[in-house]
């Protein structure tokens, strides 16, 4: 009998160890991991530089509270602000917490209370971030959501313009809706959102929780578009598996988050900061990010060449190493078959297979994954 709440639909796999792009279960099976803890282990499992950094901090101190000056927090904040164009950082423990902080900051800084998000978005499972999320399925049974959130269709600028008003504090935007189906933002829509924010004095919050920290081949995905955010949220890949999140903001917002206005007991924990510093030092190297771009191109071109002619495949889309394969039917049976063959992938909605390999994946491993996907989906097309 399990003593855990059954909040997760668990796979029938028990992982015992991991190294690089590989995971191993209690039956001795090896898996090529194209889930990465859901875009978390960007440097793969047990990356030696992250292990060494956390191990060193373990022998120093683990926690002293944010009443003290903690130099490693400043180091990580400097790395984040330098790469993002932001000016200040609030550390927390997860993406939902980062988005909660962003929502609070937007309301306090502007004195307004309405926030616009998009259908099929995902921003977290706290009451505030659940209200922000544009997917009804995660809200079932939890009663009324906060009424100050408005959801409009993604990539629909006319719908957005109809909703914004004098009480709109912020627009929250994902450049790629990872959980919602790997839906890519239209470049013209991105530029139009930016213009609407500037024209009406609305804060632009970009949720980079799944796309940030190099996943798309740039430090942050928004940097590939005409977007000038006031706030950015990150988590997932920031600690490579160590729980850490962050909200980044511009200079004009700093005074709104004065002492006592927000906080987190464990936010900026020294162990988490050690992991994050090691991750950012590695990922934010130009050669590393360039390699991610090249791997992303290889993955997309390989998938298009191998799968585009299959009847079951509706569309292949992605950016960098965040890729979705939309099918004509539900993806769950194929995800299970791939897992049984040693390739771990996951869904993004019912009909999309999502690929999130570690950013350190090799060219050979990308080819291996494409081959496995072709075998499974080709068989399905033959039987259709």
Curated annotation (Swiss-Prot):
UniProt-annotated location(s):
Cytoplasm
Q: Does the keyword Transferase apply?
A: yes
UniProt catalytic activity: N(2)-acetyl-L-ornithine + 2-oxoglutarate = N-acetyl-L-glutamate 5-semialdehyde + L-glutamate
Residues with the modification N6-(pyridoxal phosphate)lysine, per the entry, are 236
- Which cofactor(s) are needed, names only? pyridoxal 5'-phosphate
The cellular component terms of Gene Ontology attached to this UniProt record, alphabetical and capped at eight, are:
cytoplasm
Major subcellular location class: cytoplasm
Q: Which GO terms describe its biological process?
A: L-arginine biosynthetic process
Query: What GO MF annotations does this protein's record show?
Result: identical protein binding; N2-acetyl-L-ornithine:2-oxoglutarate 5-aminotransferase activity; pyridoxal phosphate binding
- Pathway it works in: Amino-acid biosynthesis; L-arginine biosynthesis; N(2)-acetyl-L-ornithine from L-glutamate: step 4/4
Kindly state what the record says about how the cofactor is bound.
Binds 1 pyridoxal phosphate per subunit.
Q: What else is known?
A: May also have succinyldiaminopimelate aminotransferase activity, thus carrying out the corresponding step in lysine biosynthesis.
Q: What is this protein called?
A: Acetylornithine aminotransferase
**Which species does this protein come from?**
Halalkalibacterium halodurans (strain ATCC BAA-125 / DSM 18197 / FERM 7344 / JCM 9153 / C-125) (Bacillus halodurans)
Q: Which gene encodes it?
A: argD
């Amino acid at each position: 009998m399990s003593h855990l709440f059954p909040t997760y639909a668990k796979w029938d796999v028990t992982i015992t160890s991991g190294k690089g792009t590989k995971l191993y279960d209690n039956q001795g099976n090896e898996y090529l991991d194209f889930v990465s803890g859901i875009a978390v282990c960007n440097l793969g499992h047990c990356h030696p530089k992250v292990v060494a950094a956390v191990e060193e901090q373990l022998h120093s101190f683990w926690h002293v509270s944010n009443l003290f000056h903690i130099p490693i927090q400043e180091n990580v904040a400097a790395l984040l602000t330098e790469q993002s164009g932001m000016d200040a950082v609030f550390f927390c423990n997860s993406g939902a917490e980062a988005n909660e902080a962003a929502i609070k900051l937007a309301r306090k800084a502007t004195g307004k209370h309405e926030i616009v998000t998009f259908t099929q978005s995902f921003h977290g499972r706290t009451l505030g971030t659940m209200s922000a999320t544009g997917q009804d399925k995660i809200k079932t049974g939890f009663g009324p959501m906060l009424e100050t959130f408005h959801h409009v269709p993604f990539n629909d600028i006319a719908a957005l313009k109809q909703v914004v008003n004098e009480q709109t504090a912020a627009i929250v935007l994902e450049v790629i809706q990872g959980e919602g189906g790997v839906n890519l933002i239209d470049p013209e829509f991105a530029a139009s959102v930016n213009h609407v924010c500037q024209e009406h004095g609305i804060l632009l919050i970009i949720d980079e929780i799944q796309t940030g920290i190099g996943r798309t081949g740039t430090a942050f995905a928004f940097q590939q578009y005409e977007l000038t955010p006031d706030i950015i949220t990150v988590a997932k890949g920031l600690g490579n598996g160590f729980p850490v999140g962050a909200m980044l903001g511009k200079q004009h917002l700093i005074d709104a988050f004065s002492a006592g206005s927000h906080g987190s007991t464990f936010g900026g924990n020294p162990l988490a900061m050690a992991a994050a510093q090691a991750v950012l030092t590695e990922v934010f190297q130009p050669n590393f990010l360039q390699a991610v771009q090249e791997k992303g191109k290889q993955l997309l071109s390989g998938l298009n060449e191998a799968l585009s002619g299959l009847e079951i495949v509706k569309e292949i889309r992605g950016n960098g190493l965040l890729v979705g394969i939309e099918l004509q039917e539900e993806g769950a049976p194929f995800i299970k078959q791939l897992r049984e063959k040693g390739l771990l992938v996951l869904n993004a909605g019912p009909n999309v297979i999502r690929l999130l390999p570690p950013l350190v994946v090799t060219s050979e491993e990308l080819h291996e994954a494409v081959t496995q996907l072709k075998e499974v989906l080709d068989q399905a097309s033959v039987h259709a």
